């Protein structure tokens, strides 16, 4: 990138950071911390919880779904709901089934009345067969303060990756069905989406990528799940890893080497000591107040987990945190209390 482009990008980031800081200073007293999630297989819809103390999350809408699955043939689940509030609108994406080539999108101004759901197909039919996946999992929606657009990260296994026999997949043996990588699609209006492109590939099966801008260091922070079996000698997984980009250009992130695992197997943060039950997935990261907040799922152990950190290095694991029963893989997000219809 030329120096003039770098200077323009820096100026845009400074302006975005100033706007973000002003917004937090004004809105923080009236903001609510919310958590969207699903239960069981996702057939019942999207649920919503809130917290006043950051330790106990209570279900809203009398513990009933705030959004029910659209009746799409073969794509009628609402797993991994990711919600983002921006400029008065809640944007939501979700996994619509275990197999397929779409994810779902809908929007709302109050988390009660939703737009007509639409199917987003990030891989066009024009792509070669070996680049057409049969799964689109865990879409995570983000707003880019520099580009002033939105991007969705998600995981897919293409036949090309599955058949390369490099043993980078979940069980480390050639031919395993899933060898996910993280892809990206971008949009400005949620009507047209860019063609999916490979976004993060460090040579191992990965999923559940979530990113947040760090105003202090002027870069992006990513937390991602390594899907590989915890018993493998090379890159043992079922855990969460953290990395940072070199700057704020989300199209050219240039991520640094991964840290040691921060949650799940082979990490300092887990609840159940059994390797199979301490696996971590579905992270959600939020900056609120003076802390970073991290929620993740221990699906085999049956509990969501919560940790906080002032610097993304020293973590406090709040093992006593409470979430609604059977809550799974969701998203922490902030919104003005006046924008949320549900009071209980």
Regions found by a protein language model. Give the residues of each.
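Bacterial N-terminal signal peptides that target proteins for export
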Residues: 2-14
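Bacterial N-terminal signal peptides
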Residues: 13-23
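Carbohydrate-active catalytic/glycan-binding domains of CAZyme proteins
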Residues: 25-344
